[in-house]
Amino acid sequence: MSSSSHKRIIGIDFGTKRIGVALSDPLRMFAQPLGTFDMEGLVRVLSRVRDDEGIELVVVGYPMSDKGEENRMTGVIDRFVAELRESFPGTLIETFDEHRSSRTAMKILAASGSSRKKRNEKGRLDTAAACLILQGYLDSHS
């Protein structure tokens, strides 16, 4: 496993259908897409990254409302975070405001020249949103 200073940070965009996942580089400067998974697949990939690279922290997007208030999804995210903590005891798991991450991800994908069909491929938006969540976290802690 890597030394403590080079452990990775995972970013997660939780959705009811898919879970977008991003991974920091070893220096924790950039978010890289890892893919989209269901819960079972997520546990497998987190276990693999933990064993191969080490995980310092898992950052889960927390969807606050425009007014900064909790909403219907925040309760779902709270339960998801509790499940992650149970599955990965000893791993730090934090939430990070993901306000409008999916909307921003869609705009970035559109601006990148991706066709509408490409932008709407399963998981592409979820992974892009996970990257935005993780990059926001990395930028705010640099």
Swiss-Prot record:
<keyword id="KW-0540">Nuclease</keyword>
<dbReference type="InterPro" id="IPR012337">
    <property type="entry name" value="RNaseH-like_sf"/>
</dbReference>
<dbReference type="GO" id="GO:0000967">
    <property type="term" value="P:rRNA 5'-end processing"/>
</dbReference>
<keyword id="KW-0690">Ribosome biogenesis</keyword>
<keyword id="KW-0378">Hydrolase</keyword>
<keyword id="KW-0963">Cytoplasm</keyword>
<dbReference type="InterPro" id="IPR005227">
    <property type="entry name" value="YqgF"/>
</dbReference>
<protein>
    <recommendedName>
        <fullName>Putative pre-16S rRNA nuclease</fullName>
        <ecNumber>3.1.-.-</ecNumber>
    </recommendedName>
</protein>
<dbReference type="InterPro" id="IPR006641">
    <property type="entry name" value="YqgF/RNaseH-like_dom"/>
</dbReference>
<dbReference type="GO" id="GO:0005829">
    <property type="term" value="C:cytosol"/>
</dbReference>
<dbReference type="Pfam" id="PF03652">
    <property type="entry name" value="RuvX"/>
</dbReference>
<dbReference type="InterPro" id="IPR037027">
    <property type="entry name" value="YqgF/RNaseH-like_dom_sf"/>
</dbReference>
<comment type="function">
    <text>Could be a nuclease involved in processing of the 5'-end of pre-16S rRNA.</text>
</comment>
<comment type="similarity">
    <text>Belongs to the YqgF nuclease family.</text>
</comment>
<dbReference type="GO" id="GO:0004518">
    <property type="term" value="F:nuclease activity"/>
</dbReference>
